[in-house]
């Protein structure tokens, strides 16, 4: 990770370093466009690496299942031939200029000049929605309360309460049921929101005694000493209380997101996203493009695979900005290989 402030000149500045950003860097390399990856996190990978490194992803083409961390490793191998610079651990604060001549400055003092910009910042700055429980911070400090599973093995033999009613809660309840002593799946409603196959697997694990469904209950209090959790107290809306002996609590109540400085860059925005032209992924500001979850347009699907396609489309559109007098002749990678 680069720590000293850098001054770089490049064809394309890519704001973000998640999977969509990494593939956009690959596409830039294939078109012989220089680029730099800039991210506030200390390592590449975005949410895949920071939040879900061991969570399987099922809709990446040619991979029946691949964990988030493994996907990032593969993408890093793919861009390795292009030796893409990375400015990590400091977010972009300001973006000024015009198409063909932009200047970006980070909080650390890095200065990047670029002919075009790709914003691949996911949902922007993100953080977990934390349950309003007294004394929560003490349990967060010890790891008794966690919002992201980085190492499933850490929960081996433990009693784990998984709170939430969506895909993340269901997926992690299933995954942890393979290593934990017991998983309690807590939701304030009787029904969960998930794919039929996932719900079927949940029922199988319930029948096997690996998961216990605790509904309709919601979190009420945590009990323990010095951040060591002993019981999770839950209640119904009618006030019925239950104490669950547990070693860990994993609340999956979604992420709170914020565009942060991006909202101050003069771009049209809509509900924490950047509207773009679907054919090019260009924003309201010529020369600034947005791809991945931060981009929006009619028919948009928030899928990694669609972000990959958007990265390719943006890179091809940018080629005309960087090389306005050179026609781009489309070639398949099988014909031209990877440029050296």
From Swiss-Prot:
Subunit details: Homodimer.
Q: Which reaction does it catalyse?
A: 2 reduced [2Fe-2S]-[ferredoxin] + NADP(+) + H(+) = 2 oxidized [2Fe-2S]-[ferredoxin] + NADPH
Signal sequence interval, chain numbering? none
Question: In this record, what's one Pfam family?
Answer: Pyr_redox_2
Residues recorded as binding FAD, renumbered to this chain, are 20, 39, 47, 52, 92, 126, 293, 334
Enumerate the SUPFAM superfamilies for this protein.
FAD/NAD(P)-binding domain (SSF51905)
Annotated organism of origin? Gluconobacter oxydans (strain 621H) (Gluconobacter suboxydans)
Record's protein name: Ferredoxin--NADP reductase
**What protein family does this chain belong to?**
Belongs to the ferredoxin--NADP reductase type 2 family.
